[in-house]
């Protein structure tokens, strides 16, 4: 078996381990050596139904390594019972709580990337200017 010489492959497991420590946000199955996927089920839409039927308001964030900087973009929406995110506006009464979970995660992610992994973090060019999170 050949020894991998791609630095992104070599450090992928280390990055996964460190990013997993941020909490239940990282979805390893959706990650690649230079791209990572996070999400958060912020608000349960109906807690009175069976757990496997529940839907959630929340967000998902993707980041990709580009020239020693991780570029991110995120979206808000509903995690449906089929297990997929659907981009949808968050109802006004839940916007504060959903945004708060994203901001809290972003602070942790920013510190983790800059202090532990020694990478910068910046918004992707595809992220609308009105959605950009500033560094903590």
Q: Which stretches of residues belong to each language-model region?
A:
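Contiguous hydrophobic segments
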Residues: 1-7, 52-60, 64-67, 123-136
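Compositionally biased, intrinsically disordered linkers/stalks adjacent to structured regions
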Residues: 86-136
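Amphipathic, interaction-prone secondary-structure segments
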Residues: 24-67
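N-terminal "first-domain core" detector
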Residues: 1-24
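Intrinsically disordered, low-complexity regulatory segments enriched in Ser/Thr/Pro
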Residues: 53-96
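Short, charged/polar micro-motifs that form catalytic or ligand-binding hotspots
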Residues: 8, 12, 49-53, 88, ...
């Amino acid at each position: 078996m050949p020894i991998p010489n791609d630095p992104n492959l070599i450090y992928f497991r280390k990055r996964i381990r460190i990013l997993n420590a941020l909490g239940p946000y990282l979805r390893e199955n959706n990650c690649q050596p230079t791209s990572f996927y996070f999400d958060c089920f912020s608000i349960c839409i109906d807690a009175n139904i069976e757990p496997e039927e529940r839907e959630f308001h929340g967000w998902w964030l993707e980041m990709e390594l580009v020239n020693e900087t991780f570029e991110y973009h995120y979206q808000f929406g509903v995690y449906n019972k089929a297990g997929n995110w659907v981009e949808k506006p968050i109802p006004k009464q839940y916007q504060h709580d959903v945004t708060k979970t994203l901001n809290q995660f972003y602070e942790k992610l920013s510190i983790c990337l800059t202090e532990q992994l020694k990478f910068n973090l910046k918004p992707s060019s595809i992220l609308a200017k009105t959605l950009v999170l500033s560094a903590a």
